[in-house]
Amino acid sequence: MSTGHTIYHSLLKLPLSVMVKSSSIPSNPIEDLNIDLERPIIYALPFRSHVDLLTLQKSALELGLPDPLSPIEIEGVKYPRYVFTSIGPKMFDTDDDLPQESLDLFKIVLKHHADNPDADFQLIPTSILWGRKPGKEGTSKPHLMPLNGPQKFVTLIKAGRDSTVRISPVVSLRYMADNHGSDEAIAHKLARVAKIHFSRQKLAASGPNLPNRQALFNRLLKSQAIEKVILEEAKSRNVDVEKVRKEAMGIMEEIATNFSYSLIKNGNRILKWLWNRLYQGLNINNASTVRKLAQEGHEIVYVPCHRSHMDYLLLSYVLYHEGLVPPHIAAGINLNFFPAGPIFRRGGAFFIRRSFKGNRLYSTIFREYLAELFAKGYSVEYFSEGGRSRTGRLLQAKTGMLAMTVQAMLRGLNRPVTLVPVYIGYEHVMEVTTYAKELRGKRKEKENAGQVLRTLRKLRNFGQGYVNFGEPISLNHYLNEHAPNWSESINPIEPQKPEWMTPVVNGIANKMMTHINDAAAANALTLCATALLAANQRALSKEDLTEQLDCYLQILRNVPYSATATVPSEDADALLEHAIKLDKFVIEKDTLGEIVSLDRNQSLLMTYYRNNIIHLFALPSLIAKLVVHHDTITVEQIQEQIKLIYPFLKAELFLHYEEDELASIVNNHIDELVQQNLILRDGDTLQLCNANIRKLHLLAHTISETLQRYAIALTHLQASPDLGKDELEEQSQIMAQRLSRLHGINAPEFFDKGVFCILFNTLKTEGYLDEDGAAVLSKVEPLSQDIAHLLTPEIKLTIHAVMTKED
């Protein structure tokens, strides 16, 4: 570097230290992007800019990356560690050709790779984004634009403290040299590819131009679909067309978002303060997959599970910090109250009524509005379950929004549409006490400002929060596979509902929910809750609880549930200490040590957190249950019984294992339990290990309540084979409530009618019911006997007593 540049950089550093505050995406690039610090690194920036270079230098040093201003040595000669892919404008120049010095460095590096087979330099494309404000409808400007001196100065004043250093995945120059050669044309190709990449990054970060709200309404009113329904409504109701048109405008005002970047930017500061006050940390996983989809131009639909009203804010906050545009969020009309409604609307919320069946005007306008969002390229978010889960378990999907998404594709969208399932987890859900009261029968309180203020008063440290992005689902690929002729149904005007629509949407919904559960985050509280709720009297010594946590951790680490599920990196001791600090347990001391327990009220609340991860332990718990209740059992017998029971667990808990991989997974879990010395193996025979029987019993108990529900329903079917769906659900629910009272079962979902509905549907699909809905006793009886063998004598006696009384 020349002396002049060195002096210039020194003079720039002081004002930049005051004017510029940058965040880096990703925040841990060495790990997230697999950057090898042992291999040489060269940075590629979009424009010749000393301000950008110095901003990169500051971030690189903070992140542990090489200083871009330190030279790189090639064959004994020192060269700059950076290249610019465009000259960028001078005061009166807009030339954007590849700078000669960058071209020369590319040629030198590529020749070095051609001459040295072991050389493998890493090229890291890096761009500095000065602000992320999207443009306005009707304006046109490039997504990434070079700035001359005066423009850069103005930008620094406006957006210097709203800048982002985007670090992209590494490009292997060894790969480029081996596959594309090392001549000058390749250097130009590298620069062109980098420019396209930088432009896509900017679009992914700021999003498409924001619409003029009034122009959007006028455009929707003129759409053929809405115009047609307005005329039909006016005719059927015998009213003036203008009156219906005015009504339509009112519906649009009620629905449409009024997105404000300034609110997002300023709200980010408030939310940062809020998260720091509420949580000890936010854990985000697999965000790079979503960034890649955004840069490839996908229409992204985020489909998170719904635990809390905080979900709305948390996901938008996380996406903003991951360099993505906060989505337009479908929110229930119940949240449109002052002052929250206007704030949510400016933060990207569009409001939807809970039900609009039979209201053609509303449904048409909403469908057209959603199609407009997709057509313009705005990312969208809606909650897969419709409402918040009161039990902590993933609910069955509400398919209305999903069906409208598919219908929007049938309007002729020219971009791929991809669902991104999102698992959101907390170590404390603010509404959990309210959920418990509602499950006991208290009427749900309508959302209002007073409720918000009461919640704010309770703000305290809630431990950790988790946002795990699941495996994306390409709707285009799914439709191609399950409805190969779907494109024949494309109609830009009339909403289509071809014969394949309902089964395909149901299939997508099930896959979506399964991918959400695949991305589950086990944490200190969910693991402690699982162990304590399995214990007699909901109490364990501190040592026993630590051992049980270690058992769970080994299972999750050694037999990973999925590629997107996450497991704490801490050991059992550290997790327990963290959980105790959350102040949710009763800690008692005696001469023998400490006892950790749950009081009756906390036992009910803790079921919520256990239910977040119960699916992770469904199979190992069932294996443990089979060993515990049979004392000695063969692997073949375990495989046979699990094959019978698994379809019910799969449907209820959204488990992802297919039938052809189930045996292998079961064997892996058996091997793990043997490795932990929880069971003993002699050839093909398994038996209890008395030394660790307590840990095996605790593991086995996790699935007990689920099996008890199955036993209740199957016992009813055996006694009354012709029992209809509604009767089976009602009678099973009554018996479950009785069991709950008599045996101290605190889990609110134990007698949830919806769970029995899922069970009935699975009985039908698995052939336990005939076409008329009557029980096929030749199949029901063996399953019922197998499950009954896994119940305690007390539970079996109660079920028998209730059935006798009913008879």
From Swiss-Prot:
Task: Report the catalytic activity.
Answer: sn-glycerol 3-phosphate + an acyl-CoA = a 1-acyl-sn-glycero-3-phosphate + CoA
EC annotation from Swiss-Prot or TrEMBL: 2.3.1.15
Keywords from the UniProt entry: Acyltransferase, Cell inner membrane, Cell membrane, Lipid biosynthesis, Lipid metabolism, Membrane, Phospholipid biosynthesis, Phospholipid metabolism, Transferase
Q: Which residue positions does the secretion signal occupy?
A: none
The compartments listed are: Cell inner membrane
User: What InterPro entries is this protein classified in?
Assistant: GPAT/DHAPAT (IPR022284), GPAT/DHAPAT_C (IPR045520), GPAT/DHAPAT_LPLAT (IPR041728), GPAT_PlsB (IPR028354), Plipid/glycerol_acylTrfase (IPR002123)
Q: List the disulfide bonds.
A: none
* Pfam families the UniProt entry points to: Acyltransferase (PF01553), GPAT_C (PF19277)
The record's top EC class is transferase
GO cellular component, alphabetical, reads: plasma membrane
Family recorded in the similarity comment: Belongs to the GPAT/DAPAT family.
What is this protein's record name? Glycerol-3-phosphate acyltransferase
**Source organism (scientific name):** Aliivibrio fischeri (strain MJ11) (Vibrio fischeri)
User: What does the record give as the organism's lineage?
Assistant: Bacteria, Pseudomonadati, Pseudomonadota, Gammaproteobacteria, Vibrionales
